[in-house]
UniProtKB/Swiss-Prot annotation:
Residues 150-199 form the bHLH domain. The keyword Zinc does not apply. The gene is BHLH7. Residues 124-154 are annotated as: Disordered. One of its GO terms (cellular component) is nucleus. It comes from the Eukaryota. It is found in: Nucleus. The lineage of its organism: Eukaryota, Viridiplantae, Streptophyta, Embryophyta, Tracheophyta. This is Transcription factor bHLH7. Keywords: DNA-binding, Nucleus, Transcription, Transcription regulation. It comes from Arabidopsis thaliana (Mouse-ear cress).
Length: 302
């Protein structure tokens, strides 16, 4: 080792990575050829000790090899066991060059290992990706809305009972007023209200006529003209209605359908009352002079 330090640095030529690569391949082939003969003559002997190549940067210094871990068999004494790692002592006074050492390690070791591992990976079939798992149904079930009539909430039960009571009352009103509109609930209620008002008026008129208060009944009767002029003649209104068949129509409807008769009278602003009461109301009213016909004066001839 001391002699190597005295050698000038200019005289040492660094071997190229290609030369080291071929030297390691040749050393590996020599070792494999001689290891069979060495191991065949020795029985029960353990594996040979690993050798470490200490190169000084000169080809003549590769023969200086030392055994690591003590002496070994004779067959392995002069053989070189390449590790793929060489310690160059040629330059730097016994220290390694980081750039050259790393380059040699990458070229020798990594390339050899990668080339040896390629057939293994290329020989095996590629693993197929696992098929996607079907979408698992969530354990939480969506909230199902209760059907009508099966609610358990107290507020919902009370609301359902209220709707049932309203429907029963409307059916009862439909029975009282047969001719009412049953398709539209709002229109049906309006017709029922008008019908009730008409009945209240009839009750007042009939009750007061029995008590003899004809004068008090008159303001309750719907205002209507008591006379009209037809061809220069004064005629009572009820006489006209009697002549045009209104009375007979109302009498017929009273026998068949009372509700229809009430609606007909209401449309004509009439109400039912005894004849005696009607005559009393008529005689109690003063004669209407405003309805008399005033004939225009005739211009005298010139």
């Amino acid at each position: 080792m001391a002699n190597n330090n005295n050698i000038p640095h200019d005289s040492i030529s660094d071997p190229s990575p290609t030369d080291d690569f071929f030297e390691q391949i040749l050393g590996l082939s020599n070792f494999s050829g001689s290891s069979g003969s060495g191991l065949s003559g020795i029985g029960g002997v353990g594996p040979p000790p690993m050798m470490l190549q200490l190169g000084s940067g000169n080809e003549g210094n590769h023969n200086h090899m030392g055994a690591i871990g003590g002496g070994g068999p004779v067959g392995f004494h002069n053989q070189m066991f390449p590790l793929g790692l060489s310690l160059d002592q040629g330059k730097g006074h016994g220290f390694l060059k980081p750039d050259e050492t790393g380059k040699r390690f990458q070229d020798d070791v990594l390339d050899n290992r990668c080339s040896s591992m390629k057939p293994i990976f290329h020989g095996q079939p590629m693993s197929q990706p696992a098929p996607p798992m079907p979408h698992q149904q969530s354990t939480i079930r969506p909230r199902v809305r209760a059907r009508r009539g099966q609610a358990t909430d107290p507020h919902s039960i009370a609301e359902r009972l209220r709707r049932e009571r309203i429907a029963e009352r409307i059916r009862s009103l439909q029975e009282l007023v047969p001719t009412v509109n049953k398709t539209d609930r709002a229109a049906m209620i309006d017709e029922i209200v008008d019908y009730v008002k008409f009945l209240r008026l009839q009750v007042k008129v009939l009750s007061m006529s029995r008590l003899g208060g004809a004068g008090a009944v008159a303001p309750l009767v719907t205002e209507m003209p008591l006379s009209s002029s037809v061809e220069d003649e004064t005629q009572a209104v009820w006489e006209k209605w009697s002549n045009d068949g209104t009375e007979r129509q109302v009498a017929k409807l009273m026998e068949e359908n009372v509700g229809a008769a009430m609606q007909l009278l209401q449309s004509k602003a009439l109400c039912i009352m005894p004849i005696s009461l009607a005559m009393a109301i008529y005689h109690s009213q003063p004669p209407d002079t405003s309805s008399s016909i005033v004939k225009p004066e005739m211009n005298p001839p010139p």
